Structures are given as C-alpha cells and as structure tokens.
Amino acid sequence: MRSLVVALTVARTLAAASVFASDQGVEPESGAPFSVTAGGRAVAVQEISTPVVWLKGRDAQPYWYAQFDSSSPVEVRVKARAGVDRLQVLPKKAAIRTTRTGDDEVAFTLAPSCQVVVEPNGRHRALVIAANLPETDVPDAKDPNVVFVQPGRHRRNLKLASNQTLYLAPGAVLEGSVCGAGTNITIRGRGAISGLCWGHYKGPGGRMVHPGGFVHPGGHVVHLEGSQITVRDIMIVGAWSWCLVLDKTDRVLVDNVKILGGHVINDDGIDICRSSDVTIRNSFIRAQDDTIAPKWWCENLLVEKCILWTDAANAFRVGYECLPENGRGFRNLVFRDIDVLHLSLHKNKPETFWANCAIFIQPSNATAFENLLFDDIRFDSVERGDIFLNIKTQSIVGTLTRSKEAGRLRGCTLRNIHIANPFDAETMRVHLEAADAAHPIEGVVFDDVTGYGRVSAVRTSAPSPRPHRQ
C-alpha cells in the first residue's frame, strides 16, 4: 500500500521544550475576546462558530478554544475582554485558584493532561483550554499504513481500512468526513477534524443508518466500524450531524478527545451503537445535542474522567433508538468520575416526549436494559427547571424502530452524587414512568445521592434510597 501524506510538507520532530503550541500552522483569530499564554509563550485562540440551527438569540453564542503541550505544570495567563470580576474556571473538581494579574487578566497553574473552561460571565462566550502531554510517538509519514495529515487546512473525505492509522499533525485541520471499517484502526494526533463548513445534515458523506433502515446522505463526521479501534488526542470541531459514531464495534478506546460541538442540533458527541467493550475516558465533549448516547444496543461500556456540556439536550441519553439483535441489549454500562458543566438551555417537564435531562434512559423496542451504574457524577451548574433523572419504558413508532413494544429496565444504581440545588423541588426532578406492568422499571437504587428534587413514579416504584454516608 502506497503511503498517503496530505500536503507536501516534510514531517519534522519538535525541539524539546517545556511548553510548545499544539496548533502550529493555524492562524490565531484576530478578533478573539481572549489572549492566552502558557509558560510565557503565546497560545493561539480559535473560535468555535456561532450555532446556525436551533439555538437562537442570546443563546446562540460562539466560544473559543486553545491548547498547548507541556511536560509539567505551567502558569497560564488569560486576558478576557469581558473582564475577570466574575470569572470562574470549571470544572470545580479541578480546584483551580486564579490570581488577578491585571484589570482583565488572571493567572493559574495547569498540569497536563487536563481540560478546563474559563467563563468570564457564565456559560456563554467561554474559553476551553487543554493542556496536553507532549507527543512522543509521532508516526513515520512514509509508513504505508499511515495517512499523515500535515499542518494546514485540507478539504477531503477519508476512508480507513484494517491496520491503518490516521495521524493529524499539530495545526492540521481536515475538513470532511472520516469513515473506517476493519480491525486495528487508529485516529490520533493534535490536529482537528472539522464540520464547520457544512450546514445541518448537509455534510459531505459518511454513513448515517438507523435501525429502521433510514440512511441520511449527509453522514457523520467520524464513523467507525470494526474491532480494536483507538481514537485519541484529536479535536472534532463543529458538526453537521453526529460527531463520533462507534457502530458495530468492539474493543474500542477513546482517550483525550476534545469534541467542540454546538454548531447545529443533532450533533451528538459520541454515539455508541451496536457495540461492546468500549472505553471512553479523559475527554471533553460539548454538543447542542446529547453528549454521550449509547444506541441500538450497547454492552460493557465504561465512560470515565470526562467533562460534558450539553446546550439543548441530554448529558447522558441511553436508548430511544433501540434494536435488540440476537438478544443484545443495554448491559453493564458504567459512567463514573464525570463532570457535567452545564445542562440544556431549553427547560421542559420530564413527562414531555422530548425532555432534556442530565440522565435520560429510554428502553424501547422490546429491548432489555440491565446493570447500569452512574457513580461520582458532579454537576457544576444547576439552573431552575433542570431535570436530574428520567427513566421511561416507552413505545416509539417511526423510522427509528421495528417494534411498537416498549423495553424494560432491571438494575440502575446512582451512587455518590451530590447536587447543589439552590432552587425548589421542581428543579433536578426524578421521574420514572413504566409503559405498563409487562415493561417495568425495577431495581433503581440511590446510594449516597443528595440534592435532587421531587420524585414522581408512574406505574412503577420510586427509587430505593440508601442512607447518605457522612
């Protein structure tokens, strides 16, 4: 197989340094409302464009992103045109202490590898900063199994096969879709895959197949099928539909991926479809739509040490599109040690069909849901009317399903979750609604969970609480 190098730039090894930019070859935004330095060196700040579909008015705001590599903790300085009087750095778990160094500047220390969000004035017009460890394993651009994308912008679609690696060099921006099918496929690097050039469902290709057989020609930004798949360190910026789709996969690792969505609705962060033995960790995911969404069926999933942010949907959405192939279902799903920065701007009631929740579990299509665990989930911002947990066994009829029968749930534990809820009982509600006695919700346990609002249960029992541990 002949090697493919996108752009005729010769690969080079970066000189050893304590701090260096991860965005070489990318011009900084001239009108950015932030400037950033790390270890005294300027870091380019990139705009993630204003949403073009769904969010409107004051909610349709751009945000910005900066990243750098460092081998050790480093001082970061941020100048914010909006001022720093109300500035906060999230997630709160990071316990970032800022020092004011000027009228519009703060300094703080970041250790690799981590991601934080700087908010001068709330959730709108924020700055995402990622501190990465330096790359030590840049592949050989001449390797016939490596698709090497050099710094700069490149508009094309790519298809990957077994034993291939797509490497996005620092400063590389691939505008298009990436599809891969096979065994031992890797996507990595410090560059980006961008969907910002296309409107809602107007993408250049890929696959978008629903259980009912519906295929959307726009496709996904990244669609992967197969076994032994790794996606790490890259950015996915903007999307015309779903961002990263793992479809019919097993033995998958997604690590230190930054999904910078919000361009359109239906831009799900990571969809895990018909897949097993998948690990997602150390990643930042912002989307207008659902951020983590197991679909069709999903077994043996671990999502840990991630940061989630949804603008108009659900942080976790499990199910809705369900397909119990060969007895498969949603089993052994673990979500732990996760920071949820913000929930949907669009508030509604959990009884509504398109409810927007922190956790929405929807067994449908005669599919079994068993052994789900949400452990150590932290909510940095709670707004009036947010919904904490919504579980519905329901019948869904349309192009997405093959059955009118609802699903069922047996075993869902929520553990070590403490919500700072300054509002009334209608905020961070819990709602359980079974379709009927044949499609029950069973074994929902709250273990050391505090701060949630009113609990409502329809044709089922309320969650079984375990005492708060002091």
Spans of model-derived segments:
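Extracellular/periplasmic carbohydrate-active domains that bind, remodel
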Residues: 17-470
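Classical eukaryotic N-terminal signal peptides for Sec-dependent ER targeting/secretion
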Residues: 1-2
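Bacterial N-terminal signal peptides
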Residues: 5-15
